[in-house]
Amino acid sequence: MLQKNRHFKVFLNMPLEWLLLLCPFLCGGFFPWASALVGLVLIFLLLLLLRRGLLCVALSAPFLAAASVVLFHLGGIIWGTDRGMAPVGAVQFLPLPLFVLLLEQLAPERRMDLLRRLPYAASVMVLLSFLLSCIPSLGPWFLVAGRQAGFFQYPNTYALYLLFALVLVLFGAPLRFGKLPWAAAAALGILLSGSRTVFFLLLAVVLVFFFTVKSKQSRLRILIFAALLLFISVLYVLLSGNRGSVGRFLTASLTASEFVGRILYAYDALPVILRHPLGLGFTGYRCLQGSFQTGVYSVQHVHNELLQLLLDVGWIPAALFLWALWQGFRSREGGLLRKLLLAVPLLHCLLDFDTQFISVALLLFLVLDTAPQAQRKFSPNRAVRRLSAGILTVSALLCLWIGSASFLYYLRKPADALRVYPAYTAAIADLLPTASDEDLGPLADRVLRLNKAVALAHDARAKADFSAGKISAAIAHKQEAIRLCRYNLTEYLDYFDILRYARERYLQRGDTDSADSCLSLIIEIPGMLETVDAQTSRLGRIIRDKPDLTLPPPYVSWLEQHASEFVSNS
C-alpha cells in the first residue's frame, strides 16, 4: 500500500505538467472561465488525494498568500465596489492555493521537473501563432497593432512567457546545439511581440549568462546566436518597414507615453490604496478609476501587480505575498536558475499585469520555494478531511456556476450569462446601450444595486428619470456619472443639455425658481472643467492623450447669452 501511495504522488507530476503546458493556450488563463476549468482539474486531483488519505498540508507562505487572495476577493461581497463580481474574482484566482497545495505533495526536486517541457510548448505557440496570424480571419486573435500576441492575445505577457522558457533553455542544463532551435523560437517570438521591457530583460539575461557560465563554447554559441538574431531583426525592419513589432525596440525611451503612463497609473493609485486597506474588490479599480485619475487614460489594470494586489484585495494579502517572495529569494534551493525564474517575471510585473493571466501566476508560485515548510506538514484527521472534501465540492460547484456564466459572457451572450448568474454586473451593463425605454431604468437599478460606481448605469438611470419627468433625480445621477468620468467631455455636454432642456420646461410652467436653479448649475460647468484641468498632473500632460475640457462654441455662446439673465435675476 505504501508503495502504491508513493506511485500515486509521483503520478501527480503528469497532470500538473500538462496543466502548465496547456493553460497558456487557454488565452493564458486570463478569463474567469479558463481559471474555472483549471480549478476543476486541480480540485479533482485534491479530492483523489483526500480519498486515499494522502493529502498533507503545510501552512507555507505561498499557500497563505494565495489563499488570502481568494478569501479577500470573496470578502468583496461585503466591502467591495462591485458585490456581483466578487465571486468571479474568487474563481479567477482559486487555482493558486489549490496548485500550491498540490505542489506541497511533491518533493522539491520534482517541482522543477514540471517545467522541463515548457520550452517545447513555447516553441509550438510561437510557430502556431505566426502561422495562424497569417490567416486574415484569425489575424485579430493573434496580432495587436501588428505585434505577435500569441494565445495570450496580449504581446507583453506573451513575451514574458517566452522569456521564461528561454531562461529554462539557457540555464537549465549545459547549452548544446540541440537546444538552440528552442532558444531561437523563444527569442524570435519575443522580437515579434515588440515588448520593449521584455527585450531589455532579455539583454540582462544574456549578460547574466556571459558572466556566470564558464564554458567558452556556450558563450560563443550564444554570441553567434544573438548576433544572427540581431541581423535578422534589423533586416526585417529595413525590408518590411514594419516598426510595430521588431522596430519598436529602436524607439524605446524613458519619455515614451507608454512608460510615463505606467508611472501615472501608479501615482494616481497610491492614495486610493492608503484609503482602502481591504482593497476595492475585483474590477473595483476599473470602475472607480475615472474618479481619481489625473490624466486621460482608461485601463483595466494598473500595470503593476503589487499595486494591483493592494487595490484589489488590500494590505494583508499583499504583505503575505511579499513575505513569500522574501523567503523565495532567501532560499538557496534551485540555485541561479530558480532565482532568475523568480526575478524575471517579478521585474516585468512592476510594469504590467502578468499575474492576471493565471498561467503566469502558476509559474510564479511554482518557483516560490516551499521547501523550508516541508517539516511542518501535517495530515488532516478524518473530520478535517470531510470538511475539506465539502469545501472542495462547493468550490467545484462555484467554478461550474461562475465559469459557465463567464464563458457565455466571453461568447458575447450577456443575456444568457445572466440566466446562469444573475449578478454578473458586467453582463447587465452590456445590455444597457441596446435596452428599450421600458427596460432601461430597471436594468440600471440592477447594476447600481451591485455596483454604485458604474458611470454607464448612472447615465442610463438619468435618461430614464428624465423621460419620466424626474428632473432632480436625473440631475443627481448625471452629476455622479461626471464624478466617475471627470475627463469625459461628453458627460459634461449631456449634463449641459439636460439642464438646458429642464430649464426651458420649468420656464414654460412658470417655475422661475427651478429654472434659475438649472441655469446656476449650467454656469458652474466651465468652473468644473477648469478644476479638473487644474488637477491634471504633470505626468498627465506628458502622455499621448491630452485633456479635452473645452466647451464647444455653441455651448459657450449659449452661456454668454444667458449668464446675464442669471445675474439680473439674482
Per-region residue spans from a language model:
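Extended, hydrophobic alpha-helical segments in both membrane/secreted and soluble proteins
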Residues: S195, Y285, E305-L306, D312
